[in-house]
């Protein structure tokens, strides 16, 4: 994991919004969470790492999808990713994981290869629905939390984390030709594509980023009740640990927003990171939340 938001797909070294079988996860669920994580991280690697052509990346993801389908059908998968699909097959069987959530993740990775602009917020949130929200829904499935209100709160948290990661990573994504800032919001702030591609830091671009960051923070807060629900569902110390971990994840995202604000929303040229002091702040805020 990098020093960004700890634990939505966005570069294999930056795969975020995912608690990777940490010490706070209920021990019985750590193998399942690790299997899901490695499935997602490996797919992210195929989509975003190295110097393969877009066509080669898409071909690899198609082969990976075929292995997932074989895995879900309890059939033999290829040797190439046996280390991913053997444990995942056991987890799917043991926990009855919804396969559509795993295929949604793959479709988002595929989209990241072919799509570099988003017309409006609705289009961006549709991407988040497949790139980030499945992570939360898979975890809730493992926790036995299935009610619609909790799923919606999880979606809000995961989408917010993905959006925060986008606004944190503008200095990385824009030079690669990826602009996640919705086109429909540019004109309202007097921004055009030329300014963004030139990574021009001026009042217009920083106001645009600020508006997007504030929106992500508001979305995050829609999930504020979910940690309590998870803790109540699991019960006991395991419930407290899972709820506390979720509060830490949320506070990590909000802390990144604070750090984006602290550099005056200049993330077109500067990427804020969390440090040890931030970790202490996150821990304390999560305890009080």
Task: Tell where the protein language model's regions lie, with residue ranges.
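Catalytic cores of Mg2+-dependent Asp-rich isoprenoid enzymes
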Residues: 1-161, 167-289
């Amino acid at each position: 994991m990098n020093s960004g938001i700890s634990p939505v797909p966005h570069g294999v070294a930056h795969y975020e919004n995912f608690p990777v079988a940490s010490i706070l996860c209920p021990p019985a669920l750590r193998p399942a969470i690790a299997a899901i994580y490695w499935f997602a991280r490996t797919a992210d690697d195929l989509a975003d790492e190295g110097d393969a052509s877009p066509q080669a990346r898409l071909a690899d993801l198609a082969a990976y999808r075929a292995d997932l389908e074989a895995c879900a059908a309890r059939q033999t998968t290829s040797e190439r990713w046996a280390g991913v699909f053997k444990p995942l097959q056991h987890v799917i069987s043991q926990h009855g994981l919804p396969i559509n959530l795993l295929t949604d993740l793959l479709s988002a990775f595929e989209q990241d290869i072919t799509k570099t602009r988003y017309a409006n917020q609705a289009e961006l949130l549709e991407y988040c629905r497949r790139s980030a929200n499945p992570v939360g829904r898979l975890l809730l499935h493992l926790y036995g939390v299935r009610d619609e209100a909790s799923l919606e709160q999880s979606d809000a948290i995961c989408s917010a984390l993905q959006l925060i990661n986008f606004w944190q990573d503008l200095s990385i994504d824009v030079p690669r030709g990826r602009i996640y800032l919705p086109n429909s919001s540019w004109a309202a702030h007097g921004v055009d594509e030329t300014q963004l591609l030139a990574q021009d830091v001026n009042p217009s671009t920083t106001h645009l980023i600020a508006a997007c960051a504030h929106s992500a923070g508001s979305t995050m807060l829609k999930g504020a009740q979910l940690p309590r629900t998870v803790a109540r569902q699991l019960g006991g110390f395991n419930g407290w640990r899972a709820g506390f971990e979720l509060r830490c994840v949320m506070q990590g995202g909000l802390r990144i927003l604070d750090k984006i604000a602290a550099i005056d929303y200049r993330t077109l040229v500067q990427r804020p990171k969390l440090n040890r002091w931030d970790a202490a702040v996150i821990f304390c805020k999560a305890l009080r939340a």
